[in-house]
Amino acid sequence: MCIRDRIKIIPEIKGSGIPYTEGVMRGQIKYRTIHVFVGTILNSFISFFAGLPLGGEGPSVQVGGVIGQGVDQVFEKVDPRAKAFNRLAITGGASAGLAVAFNAPLTGIIFALEEGHKRFSPSIFLTSASSVLFATLISRLLRLATTGTFSGYFMFKMVDLESIPLNNLWMLLILGILIGLAAALFSKIQVVTKVLLDKFKIPTLARLIVAFVLVGIIGVFLTDILGGGSGLIKKIAALDFTWQMLLLLLVVKLFLIAICSNSGTTGGLFVPMLAIGALFGGLFGHLFMAMGMEEVYYRTMVIISMSAFMGGVVRAPLTAMVLIAEVTGSLMSGFFETGIVICLAYFTVELLDIQPLYDTLLEGTLYQLHKGQERKIVTFEINIEDGSFAAGRAIRDILWPSGCIVQKIVKMNKEGQIVSRMDKDGERLIHAGDVYIIQAETYNEEELREQLDCLVLNPKTVKIKKQKSGN
């Protein structure tokens, strides 16, 4: 009931946390800083100690994003220009949260670019990199204080993987297609479960009770299904299970993840996805051993499957590849084989027309949030002021409000003539005195205008406008 009540008050904390945080990073939705910070921590602790098959990395990303926003809000009181950095601050906090959760700094940086914003920008890179490095330093200092060791650790420490020999490379082709099908199945199960629960209007309290009771009962007989799955992954890689046991664990884990992640409780899907990928990899590894593959390559198959499965579900292959390298300690071993399987899995899921899971979950959140509201297409003519956040930066380096496109630029050329220009794929530098024609699709025109003002107006002008509107 505690979880249900908190979800009612703070619906932002439902589920993984990553899809919602991505929406905030992209400017599509907002955080309520204190509410989300406290609610996420409390609910994720309950989920963790109850043994739900969910991970802690989703809440870590959400808490990191909230901290980033909170820090930016503090600076806003001192310097109005800080508001223009809001989404960058959230991005930095979120990427740092993921990096610390996995002790995977490079993954945190790539996540911000490939998954969070789905584009490369120097400002996003520098913000996420500086946040990740500083957070990693703090994490290691805390580790030094508690364990006496300053160095990092590997979540699934493994010796270098054996490279698949040339005569067995055909197995990787089959594995890639099979993992792609498995990723599509997982995504479909998640979406269908959510649709069915919503269709039959199952109350949140009932969903939570069913989730906690099922985990409690099944966990008595199958302790390996409890928690996110990091311990399970180590056992699978060590060849501790028969194929029959792997199949049983896979079916139960798939079922429980679908029920728990759609119950409304707080918990991530990153580690559970890796666990499901490992289970599929273990099953296919047993199949390939029956077909003549040597046992020494089994672990390689499991690790590759984890990476490819996550890449197929989330549709972030580079993040998946680097994450597995960082959490296992096998930085280059098996890189070639992993690349082959990830590409095949990715193409398989694309051919099946399955949408990336986090994007699907975010779309559902946005639909519920804006249900009944009218979306308008509006055009703004804005003047770039000297001393503004945007002046001197490239168009692509600005995190424009969600739904905005630069339609036309009106400026004075070297001959003193007024000319119209296009944005040159975001490469054009923004100069004070330019006039930008911005077209936007929005639910809230006033809020959008305020966001644009923070980017293109001098802070003093923004302050004066706020004072006038306050009066």
Question: What residue spans do the PLM features occupy?
Answer:
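Intrinsic-disorder/low-complexity, polar/charged segments enriched in Ser/Thr/Lys/Arg/Asp/Glu/Gln
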Residues: 232, 377-381, 435
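Long, charged amphipathic helices and adjacent flexible linkers at domain junctions
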Residues: 357-382, 457-468
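Acidic, Ser/Thr-rich low-complexity segments on the non-lumenal side of membrane proteins
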Residues: 38-45, 379-405
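Short flexible coil/turn linkers enriched for glycine and charged/polar residues
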Residues: 316, 374-376, 389, 401, ...
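Structured cytosolic regulatory/catalytic domains appended to multi-pass membrane proteins
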Residues: 367-372, 385-388, 422, 429
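Cytosolic Rossmann-like ligand/nucleotide-binding regulatory domains
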Residues: 391-461
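Alpha-helical transmembrane segments and immediately membrane-proximal extracytoplasmic
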Residues: 4-370
